[in-house]
Each structure stands twice: as C-alpha cells, then as structure tokens.
C-alpha cells in the first residue's frame, strides 16, 4: 500500500469449516464411497499426514478389554482435550466409569461405560439435551484435529529444537 501500512493477514480457523474438513477426512478413511468434496478457501491449506491421521483412529466395542486410563491417553494422543465442564467439539469428559466423547466432526456425542477394564455399554446422545439416541455395539473415533502426528515425530522434533537451542546459546 502507498501509505506503508501493514495489513495483518487473518489466519483464523472457521470452526464449522474445520468440522466439515474433519468429517470429510473421517468419512474417506472409513471407506465410504459416497463422498463429494466441494472446493472452498480451506482447500488451499494443507492437511496433516494421512498415515498419522489413520494411525490415531480409535476403535472400541462392547466387551473389549481396555484400561480406561489407556483409552483417555489414546484420546489425548488423537488431540481430544479433557474438559469436564465445557463439553464441546473435540473434547471428552469423565465421571467415574463413564466417558463422554464429542467428536470434532460430528453433532452427536458418545458415551462409553466401563465395568472395570471392559467396555460395558456404548451409546450415542444429543450433547445439548443429553438424551440418548441409540445403543451401539462398536464405535470408531477419528482424531479431533487434522494435524495429529505420531509420538516419534514429536520426540524427534523436540530433540531437534533442543539441539538448535543449545547451538544458539553457544553462538
């Protein structure tokens, strides 16, 4: 501009578009063949590594033996955030043996009930009213963010950053 005015670019993420991007990616990875992708401005931005995304998909089913804390860790690794008060997209909450998950790509939330280290019940429910929609025998949860990555890549990046930091300090 002629006035030497800097105009800051706004790179804010529209929550609804992000939800649709995650929904599309999840549907494609689930094997659905009836997906239509319509271009939007968000298409100019990259997505994460599809292998990392699919490696962070969580599958649960009634009768499956899994420690509740291990499942919570898997949810955190898939970029879900624990929030027992503000239950919104991409969050989960825990109360005793009950785990509620609100996927970032869905308007339906899911309740997983444990009996010791076994999944006893899986239900879908309306996250606003809390009313039960249906009982499920299994559930597939896709990552809460398209930029999910592996622990190995995080460790490598952390080590590289630390080495760079030490080099800068010496410099």
Q: Where do the protein language model's features map onto the residues?
A:
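ASCE RecA-like P-loop NTPase motor cores
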Residues: 1-171
């Amino acid at each position: 501009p002629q006035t030497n005015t800097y105009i800051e670019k706004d790179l804010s993420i529209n929550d609804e578009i992000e939800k649709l991007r995650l929904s599309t990616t999840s549907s494609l990875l689930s094997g659905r063949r009836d997906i239509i992708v319509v271009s939007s401005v968000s298409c100019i931005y990259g997505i994460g590594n599809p292998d990392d995304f699919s490696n962070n998909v969580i599958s649960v089913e009634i009768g499956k033996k899994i420690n509740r804390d291990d499942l919570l860790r898997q949810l955190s690794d898939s970029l879900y955030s624990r929030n027992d008060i503000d239950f919104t997209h991409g969050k989960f909450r825990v109360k005793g043996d009950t785990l509620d998950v609100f996927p970032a790509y869905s308007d339906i939330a899911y309740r997983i009930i444990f009996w010791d280290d076994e999944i006893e019940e899986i239900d879908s429910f309306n996250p606003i009213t809390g009313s039960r929609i249906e009982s499920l025998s299994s559930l597939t949860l896709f990552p809460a963010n398209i930029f999910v990555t592996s622990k190995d890549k995080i460790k490598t990046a952390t080590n590289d950053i630390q080495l760079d930091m030490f080099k800068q300090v010496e410099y």
